[in-house]
Amino acid sequence: MNLESKGVRLVALASLFGLAAISSVRADVPTDLRLDLVAMSRLPTQAQRTSALSNLLPRWVAVDLDTARLTVENWPDESARPMLLGETAWYWGERDVRAALDWAKGLRLENERYAAVRSAIRRFPYEAAREARAEVLRLPAGKIRDKVAEQLVEEFHRGREAAEWCAAYPDAIVAPILVRKVTRSWILTAFVKDANLNAESELIEEWAFELSDIRLREAAFAGALDGFCRLIYYPRPCREPQPIRRLLRYIDDGVLREQLTSEINEAWQKKFPDDVGNPTTVRK
């Protein structure tokens, strides 16, 4: 088959492997990419074809989005399809995040929709965090929206504004989960930026005490403690017992307080085995 001839269509062995969409690749697609697509269609196993497609997607989406998208939507390996759809949304979102998100929201299966929506939402830049959060709330209520919200909070949403959004999240079960994640991220980010951790902890406490819902308040304190616990394991470990002791005193739930105390002490003893003390003892 002469790939250089005008108007050529990639047929190769595509139809045998459920890759019929490849036969619609535009003639102006670079020859090297078309050759790679033919080579992909000739690979002997589905796993090999899936891996090859994943590697080709950045180039393919950039020059022939419609055919790439159609191929991924109809990919015969159902277990790999969410991953491929997520990658397609990611590469598409680099140049048009809203178009990628609209496409992702229209996918048929829930696991595929989630993978693509998650990737598209992640394409919003840090400066557009408020816009990204607004897009999350435009998603239909349910598992996909909740999981995407958790991912956003974990990845790049920090500080009081993000915390307030988490506290106001329109699901009473999910909101405390988001609050705990956002205050954890708040502490971790403060550490990376060499901020005063005691002062940052006080900002979290100040905000948390404004919350009327005790579940959200305790989640805020617990998240900050999760952050301090994680920092103990850092290469440049945090040794700030004062905010840890203070935050523990604010938690009324005895079971939660004991759990956090145990986790922090265990982390401390692993990191500092020669330290006879621990960071959770409240000194009077």
Question: Model-predicted segments: where are they?
Answer:
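Non-catalytic all-alpha helical scaffold/repeat segments
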Residues: 24-284
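Bacterial N-terminal signal peptides that target proteins for export
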Residues: 2-12
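Bacterial N-terminal signal peptides
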Residues: 11-21
